[in-house]
């Protein structure tokens, strides 16, 4: 596989990631910060099912720090998703490099405390977490598996933007 074909495969993977992230953000994640009357009962039921099935304490009773991440997702990330999807599906859009690096760094930074909390928080003693909680290490790993793609794909994006020769190349503008 040539360099162009490999680059296009990664761009398509990234495009799919950003397209898939739009409904997840709108219909699941933002229920924690937007008024409940904005959502049909089916979406509320879906969130309730997910929270109980996976014992996700962050989505059952979101702590304030987690809500701040979701607010950033609403204000900064959600508007970026269709722009990034367009750029990666179209391909060869060097202008996406800096915004993609900013997005990736921001997302990776937010996922670190989320994953750390899911792995190491003593939910039995934590006042902020009510409802069902992961009780076994296996349940914690299952939850980490749900959140991990949102760390791994931005990490791939970051490395792709920093290391791919096509995106590293800076076009010199002609002087008039």
UniProtKB/Swiss-Prot annotation:
Residues 10-158 form the EXPERA domain. The chain crosses the membrane at residues 10-30, 69-89, 100-120, 141-161. Residues 1-9, 90-99, 162-176 are cytoplasmic. One of its GO terms (biological process) is positive regulation of wound healing. Changing residue 95 to A: No change in 20(S)-OHC binding. Keywords: Endoplasmic reticulum, Membrane, Nucleus, Transmembrane, Transmembrane helix. The record marks 150 as: Important for 20(S)-OHC binding and stereoselectivity. It is found in: Rough endoplasmic reticulum membrane; Nucleus membrane. PROSITE patterns: EXPERA (PS51751). InterPro entries: EXPERA (IPR033118), Sigma-2_receptor-like (IPR051987), Sigma2_recept (IPR016964). A motif (ER retention motif) lies at residues 172-176. Residues 31-68, 121-140 are lumenal. The keyword Nucleus applies. GO terms for cellular component: endoplasmic reticulum; lysosome; nuclear membrane; plasma membrane; rough endoplasmic reticulum; rough endoplasmic reticulum membrane. Cholesterol binds at residues 75, 77. It is a multi-pass membrane protein. The keyword Endoplasmic reticulum applies. One of its GO terms (molecular function) is oxysterol binding. The record marks 56 as: Likely important for receptor folding. Belongs to the TMEM97/sigma-2 receptor family. Sigma-2 receptor which contributes to ameliorate dysfunctional cellular processes and slow degenerative progression by regulating cell functions including cholesterol biosynthesis/trafficking, membrane trafficking, autophagy, lipid membrane-bound protein trafficking, and receptor stabilization at the cell surface. Forms a ternary complex with PGRMC1 receptor and low density lipoprotein receptor/LDLR at the plasma membrane, which increases LDLR-mediated LDL cholesterol internalization. Sigma receptors are classified into two subtypes (Sigma-1 and Sigma-2) based on their different pharmacological profile. Sigma-2 receptors are identified by radioligand-binding studies as a binding site with high affinity for di-o-tolylguanidine (DTG) and haloperidol. Homodimer. Interacts with NPC1; the interaction impairs NPC1-mediated cholesterol transport. Interacts with PGRMC1 and LDLR; the interaction increases LDL internalization. Interacts with histatin 1/HTN1; the interaction induces HTN1-stimulating wound healing. Interacts with TSPO. The EXPERA domain doesn't possess any sterol isomerase catalytic activity. The four transmembrane helices are all kinked owing to the presence of proline residues in each, creating a ligand-binding cavity near the center of the protein. This is Sigma intracellular receptor 2. It comes from Mus musculus (Mouse). The lineage of its organism: Eukaryota, Metazoa, Chordata, Craniata, Vertebrata.
């Amino acid at each position: 596989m040539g360099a162009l074909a490999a680059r296009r495969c990664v761009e398509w993977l990234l495009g799919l990631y950003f397209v898939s992230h739009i409904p997840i953000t709108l219909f699941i994640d933002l229920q924690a910060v937007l008024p409940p009357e904005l959502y049909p009962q089916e979406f509320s039921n879906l969130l309730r099912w997910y929270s109980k099935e996976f014992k996700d304490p962050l989505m059952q009773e979101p702590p304030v720090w987690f809500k701040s991440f979701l607010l950033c997702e609403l204000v900064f990330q959600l508007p970026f998703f269709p722009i990034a999807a367009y750029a990666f599906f179209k391909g060869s859009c060097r202008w996406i490099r800096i915004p993609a690096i900013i997005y990736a760094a921001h997302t990776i930074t937010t996922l670190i405390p989320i994953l750390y909390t899911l792995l190491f928080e003593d939910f039995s003693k934590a006042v902020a977490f009510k409802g069902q909680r992961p009780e076994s290490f296996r349940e914690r790993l299952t939850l980490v598996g749900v959140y991990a793609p949102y760390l791994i794909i931005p990490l791939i994006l970051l490395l792709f933007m920093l290391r791919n020769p096509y995106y590293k190349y800076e076009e010199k503008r002609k002087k008039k």
